[in-house]
């Protein structure tokens, strides 16, 4: 019986201490994780790695300060699933034509209930699910 190969995830590290928390989570899920800093790889080098998934990490500054992050999203969008966390999510918003602006209501250390259908990333989780929020920006 043939087995499905492990996802080959390229994680662009935007110099953030949270990056290796993401690496650990993806490893637990069975992915092969390739980490490259945002100034140590170009799009051609990333394509040569043949990832099946792309993740853009958190980091300081704005998406325009994040090295190759936005170029990676442009190159891989539509080819492989692309996931962004914090700064990575902001980069996704900007590449897709949106804007990231300050929220009129800060959500630092606040909790909220999320109701979901139990599919995808929510599989096996309670609904409603109490989640922690820590953000001061929103996408328009």
Predicted feature locations:
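Single, functionally critical "micro-switch" positions that shape active/binding sites
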Residues: 12, 85, 134
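Alpha-helical elements of the RecA-like P-loop NTPase motor core of helicases
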Residues: 20-21, 44, 90, 94, ...
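Short loop/edge segments at beta-strand edges and connector loops
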Residues: 37, 102, 133
């Amino acid at each position: 019986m043939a087995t499905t190969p492990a996802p080959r995830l390229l994680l662009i590290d935007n110099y953030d201490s949270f990056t290796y928390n993401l690496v650990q989570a993806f490893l637990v899920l069975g992915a092969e994780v390739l980490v490259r800093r945002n100034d140590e790889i170009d799009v051609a080098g990333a394509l040569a790695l043949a990832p099946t998934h792309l993740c853009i990490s958190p980091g300081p500054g704005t998406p325009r300060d994040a090295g190759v992050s936005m170029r990676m999203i442009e190159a891989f969008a539509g080819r492989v699933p692309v996931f962004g966390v914090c700064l990575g999510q902001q980069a996704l918003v900007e590449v897709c034509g949106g804007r990231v602006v300050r929220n009129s209501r800060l959500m630092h250390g606040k909790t909220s209930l999320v109701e979901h259908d139990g599919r995808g990333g929510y599989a096996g989780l309670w609904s409603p699910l109490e989640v922690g929020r820590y953000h001061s920006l929103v996408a328009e």
